[in-house]
Amino acid sequence: MNENHYLLLTPGPLTTTKSVKEVMLYDWCTWDDEYNTMVQEVRAKLVSLATKEEEKYTTVLMQGSGTFSVEAVIGSVIPANGKLLVCTNGAYGKRIVQMAEMLQIDVVISQTEEWEPTNIVEVEKLLQEDKEITHIAVVHCETTTGIINPIVDVCKLGQQYGKVTIVDAMSSFGGIEIDIADLQIDFLISSANKCIQGVPGFGFVIAKRDELLKCKGQGRSLSLDLYDQWETMEKQNGKWRFTSPTHVVHAFYQALLELEKEGGVRARYNRYYNNQKLLVNRMGEIGFKPLVDKKYQSPIITSFIYPKEGFEFQQLYNELKRYGFVIYPGKISKVDTFRIGNIGDVHEEDINRLVDCMAKGAVIG
């Protein structure tokens, strides 16, 4: 039984274990050798989760939300004469476009509907037509809807056409197995408060060493300079350039240990997958249909279409919160939806309790 005051059925921040919370009861010094050694262990563990070819990759930790780490990559990796192709079918792809435009980076957009995956044929067409494209960015799990994008195919095109590939794996890393060396991903970005099941406070970039070295002097921001952050961590045994979120780092280290204890990414994926499958089946029993086609659906978060006219999400939200659950509103404009997350310290009995509450009358029409 989860001991939280309510269960977060969200894509992060999410419900964490009691033991992850407990390690944050102590204070730590950013200059302490024990703390910086832990930072180095975290960096190494993340690379080992990402690939079996660990010598080719390194990890950079970056203060702030996951978006800070995405912007650090966009602002540091793409040179002044570079051009970025962004595959977008949701809010987080659009955010990358916004970053590029704010940073005055030339950007090309491959746009699909929010419930449809990235169109590989269109991506290749754009690469063939525009030889000036140097980088490709794609969101793995677009939590706007819960759709999974075909990063294997996107990365193959990146390799085929000689482009640097950037994968926003914010809501998938640690919950879906991938090997970034096999896929030839150059920069993968995620966050502490997603599938690793830590708390908010920093993001991280797992970067191909050869590509990261090319970023020296390219940063468009002092605090978000990816290369400078990495160089300091490398040369000073895990030290961050500016004040690091010490409590969050300790919680994340504990979360990594708990991921290992659970059986690794494959075991966690299986739990998330079973949660999501049960959720869709049980929600179907009470009249809710998922937005995304089953073959494109992630195990991370599920969008459900409003069941009828007059359905009031806010009333449902308030009632479920009274029962001890927090869910997410929808985030797309063309279809009325709401979202339920399957990740965090969430188990099948939690999913059953949620739907039982809705079946008993928490569904407000």
UniProtKB/Swiss-Prot annotation:
Keywords: Aminotransferase, Pyridoxal phosphate, Pyruvate, Transferase
EC top class named in words: transferase
Cofactors: pyridoxal 5'-phosphate
A molecular function (GO) term: 2-aminoethylphosphonate-pyruvate transaminase activity
GO biological process, one term: organic phosphonate catabolic process
Matching Pfam families: Aminotran_5 (PF00266)
InterPro entries, sorted: Aminotrans_V_dom, NH2EtPonate_pyrv_transaminase, PyrdxlP-dep_Trfase, PyrdxlP-dep_Trfase_major, PyrdxlP-dep_Trfase_small, SP_NH2Trfase/AEP_transaminase
EC number: 2.6.1.37
Reactions accelerated catalytically: (2-aminoethyl)phosphonate + pyruvate = phosphonoacetaldehyde + L-alanine
Residues found modified as N6-(pyridoxal phosphate)lysine: K194
Family: Belongs to the class-V pyridoxal-phosphate-dependent aminotransferase family. PhnW subfamily.
Protein role: Involved in phosphonate degradation.
Subunit structure as annotated in this protein's UniProt entry: Homodimer.
Descriptive protein name: 2-aminoethylphosphonate--pyruvate transaminase
Species annotation: Bacillus cereus (strain B4264)
